[in-house]
């Protein structure tokens, strides 16, 4: 296997790792039920997406 000829500096290592952060997903409030869901996805509570029923959900009795 290949081995590095020179040690990488702390600055170069830090510059490479600048994009490796954890990002919080953007959330939106469902206008139908008021629950929070990720943008551009179906609401997990009611099954609606953009005002239309996308997934048939069973109502708990």
Curated annotation (Swiss-Prot):
The organism of origin for this protein: Porphyromonas gingivalis (strain ATCC BAA-308 / W83)
Gene: rpmF
GO molecular function: structural constituent of ribosome
Biased composition (Basic residues): 1-19
Region (Disordered): 1-20
Pfam families: Ribosomal_L32p
Family per record: Belongs to the bacterial ribosomal protein bL32 family.
Keyword Transmembrane helix attributed: no
A GO cellular component annotation in the UniProt record: large ribosomal subunit
Name of the protein described by the UniProt record: Large ribosomal subunit protein bL32
Keywords for the protein's UniProt record, in alphabetical order: Ribonucleoprotein, Ribosomal protein
Keyword Ligase part of the UniProt annotation: no
Record-linked InterPro entries: Ribosomal_bL32, Ribosomal_bL32_bact, Ribosomal_zn-bd
GO biological process: translation
